C-alpha cells in the first residue's frame, strides 16, 4: 500500500516535504477557547499535531470539536482511531453524548456493551443483502476503530473515502501500525493514465510524546490493601 501510494503522500509520510496550509479556511462553528486549535486543524491540508499533557482536554474537547467542525461540511466523512479498545470506548462515549451517529469496526469481545449497537458487524445483521450493507457504510459519516481493527478491515478504505482521520493517543502507536492506513489509496485509469486517490485526505494526530505508560514495580503482596 505504501509503495504504490502517490509520491506526494509518500514524501509527506517520510517527512520529505512540508505539510501545506490553507489560511483561507474559516470556522463554521464556535468552539470557545478551542477556536484557534480547531481553525488551525481545519487549515492544515495534510497533517496537524495536537500535543498536550494528560487532562488538558485533547480528547474531550480537541478531538470532539475538530470532528464537529469537519461535519459542518455535509459531504465529509471522518474516521476516529486509537491504539486501545478502552480509548475507542472513550471516544464512543463522547459521540453518544453529542448525539453523533457512528459505526464502530471491531467485535463485541473488544467493545463496551454500551456501544455494541454501533458495531458494524451487528448493524449489518439487519441488512437484507450486500447492497444494503454498502448503503449503510456509504450513509454513515463517522467511523471508529482501533488501528489494529482497521488494519484487519483495510478493505473499508477501498470502498469509502474519508476526508479526515483523527488519531487519538497517537504517541502510543508504532509507525508500522499507521503508515499502511495513511498511505491507503484507490487507483483508477482515466484516458490511459493512472489516477491515485488517497483513501484518507487529511489526518490529525493527538497525543503526548512525553507521556509514559503506567508501570507497577511492586509485588501483589506489597500492593494489597486490607480492610482495617
Q: Which residues does each predicted region cover?
A:
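Pre-ATPase regulatory/linker segments immediately N-terminal to the P-loop/RecA-like helicase/translocase core
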Residues: 1-39, 93-97, 105, 110-122, ...
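N-terminal pre-P-loop "Q-motif" helix
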Residues: 25-49, 53, 61, 145
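Conserved RecA-like ASCE P-loop NTPase motor core of nucleic-acid helicases/translocases
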Residues: 54-56, 61-62, 66-96, 103-106
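Switch/connector loops and helix/strand junctions flanking conserved nucleotide-binding motifs
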Residues: 88-90, 111-116, 212-216
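Extended, hydrophobic alpha-helical segments in both membrane/secreted and soluble proteins
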Residues: 37, 50, 57-66, 87-91, ...
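Inter-Walker segment of RecA-like/P-loop motor cores
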Residues: 96-149
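Conserved helicase motor core of SF1/SF2 NTP-dependent helicases
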Residues: 73-76, 83-84, 98, 134, ...
